[in-house]
Amino acid sequence: IFNRNKIAVFALDLRGHGKTDGVRGHTAPRNMVLEDVDKLILYAMEKYPDIKICLYGHSMGGNIVLDYRNRGNLNGELAGYVVTSPWITLQKKVGKLQYWGIKLLAKAMPKHQIKSKIDPAALGRIDKVKKYENDQYMHGAITAQCALESFEIARDMYYDNHEKKGAGRDKPMLLMHGDKDEICHVAGSRKIAKNQEDTCDYVEWKNMLHELHNGNEESDGTQVVEQAVEFVKSL
């Protein structure tokens, strides 16, 4: 849909995912992940030097994009940001004992994998997400350091006391979340939208699940992607 609207798309496999090397789920340390985003942006700038660039992130990627908007090295060079279903507040709450356990584990064994099992039906339209079960790159793992950093950054962004530098927060952002998300609670996005209401266009999708772009029983998610396309075209 983006390409049909003459919008070029560049993507990267995050550390610990896809075809990258390393322990599966070890998308850490965060400062290096943000540097990876720098490289993606610079690559896009090199390919299209006179074209505006927008950074798009979903779920944990949404957490990373919000983080980048706050303190990324090139955050002020971007025209805008699109974030969907970000990891700010999890549906499954992390208790104090669990938090301190992960904190200790992250220090002692940062690459220790924590496995999770997510029902595909909780993600989006079943005929779209069922294929994940046979995807060789799906691993359902996150490491202790990645979990801790993502959790702490999400918490700081929720309370709006996360580190800020550059002009990223002055750039427009489209933030979207489904009110039936069973992975990342919609309350997190509502709080981000309130914290950043001057530059944030917040859209809450009724009866939509975690992967907005993959729809639900009534829709295939096309309208969500089209909303993102219209935002990018408006920049």
Set out the residue ranges of the language-model regions:
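Alpha/beta-hydrolase-fold enzymes
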Residues: 54-145
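Catalytic nucleophile-loop/oxyanion-hole region of alpha/beta-hydrolase
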Residues: 18-52, 219-224
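Short alpha-helix in the alpha/beta-hydrolase fold that links the catalytic acid
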Residues: 171, 185-195
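Short beta-to-alpha linker loops that shape the active-site pocket of alpha/beta-hydrolase fold enzymes
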Residues: 13-17, 87, 208
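Active-site nucleophile elbow and catalytic-triad environment of alpha/beta-hydrolase enzymes
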Residues: 138, 142-164
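Short beta-strand/loop motif that positions the catalytic acidic residue
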Residues: 169, 175-177, 181
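Conserved alpha/beta-hydrolase
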Residues: 1-22
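Catalytic active-site module of serine/aspartate enzymes centered on a nucleophile-bearing elbow/loop
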Residues: 199-201, 206-235
